[in-house]
Amino acid sequence: MTSKLEQLRAMTTVVADTGDIEAVTRLKPVDCTTNPTIVLKALGTDMFADAFEEAIKWGKAKGGASDAVTEAIADRLAISVGAALAKIVPGRVSTEVDADLSFDTQASLNKARAIIAQYKERGIEKDRILIKLASTWEGIRAAEVLQKEGIDCNLTLLFSKAQAIACAEAKVFLISPFVGRILDWYKKSTGENYTSETDPGVVSVRQIYNFYKVNGIETIVMGASFRNAGEIEALAGCDRLTISPALLDELDAATGDLPRVLSPEKTTPDPLVSLDEKAFRWALNEDAMATEKLSEGIRAFAKDLGTLRGMVAKKLAA
């Protein structure tokens, strides 16, 4: 009997949400996604011990423990993780712009271009990389500029249709609407339990997918942030799904029929709308879940980036 993972691969591009080299080698995803949390975890393993020491040596040669050098080393380390993944997967690796730049369009542009330049120095062209940006108004504006420069973007921390509409208008390459974090918010807020069909995160991604397909929007929809395999199965047929190694293993071990749920041919009317900055900010403000989870996600990624920079600073001072 074919595993559910193999059945999923037949209708959806499977992406691994990890920096675990062993898991990526074993599970053979098409793409990989990373974020500051994943990078921090990967750098704590023996696999990247040499890369860490090499980056510290480079930093000391650049003058040592200044904020600028510390930040540059953290960037190099994130790219070391991404470059290692790019050697394994045939597709793209997503590398995230610093979370503390989420409300600064120009700084996000500068960092994104620097990331692409560093990958190129390692022989990895921009068509192998996706620049991850938070789906703030400023992040979306940065993505709009980068797309025109031929740098494809992955808009993350996306919790609402308003964010998805703004990303579509910016013609971004790919969005990552979150599932599990939406479920977390509703379970905490209502005290209720949800099935895969009533899961608010699943419902959100289905609505966004439908809106894109019925209106001919080319931006790729990649569901992200899963709490259980049921959420993944409920989105079978989505353009892409980025999944943790643990859930990929669970799907690989599971058998039984996996029916296609999402398809461009199975859509319902949902009129195309446009959002300017005022309308975007108001729509986000009116959505308590999206507002809270976006802010929380940015804070969490910024905290992990700060932890990495702290580790670097300590090593530089040693």
UniProtKB/Swiss-Prot annotation:
The keyword Glycosyltransferase does not apply. SUPFAM superfamilies: Aldolase. It is an enzyme of class 2 (transferase). Pathway: Carbohydrate degradation; pentose phosphate pathway; D-glyceraldehyde 3-phosphate and beta-D-fructose 6-phosphate from D-ribose 5-phosphate and D-xylulose 5-phosphate (non-oxidative stage): step 2/3. InterPro entries: Aldolase_TIM (IPR013785), TAL/FSA (IPR001585), Transaldolase_1 (IPR004730), Transaldolase_AS (IPR018225). It comes from the Bacteria. One of its GO terms (cellular component) is cytosol. It catalyses: D-sedoheptulose 7-phosphate + D-glyceraldehyde 3-phosphate = D-erythrose 4-phosphate + beta-D-fructose 6-phosphate. Its EC number is 2.2.1.2. It is found in: Cytoplasm. One of its GO terms (molecular function) is transaldolase activity. The active site is at residue 132. Keywords: Cytoplasm, Pentose shunt, Schiff base, Transferase. GO terms for biological process: carbohydrate metabolic process; pentose-phosphate shunt. The keyword Acetylation does not apply. Homodimer. Belongs to the transaldolase family. Type 1 subfamily. Transaldolase is important for the balance of metabolites in the pentose-phosphate pathway. HAMAP family: Transaldolase_1. This is Transaldolase.
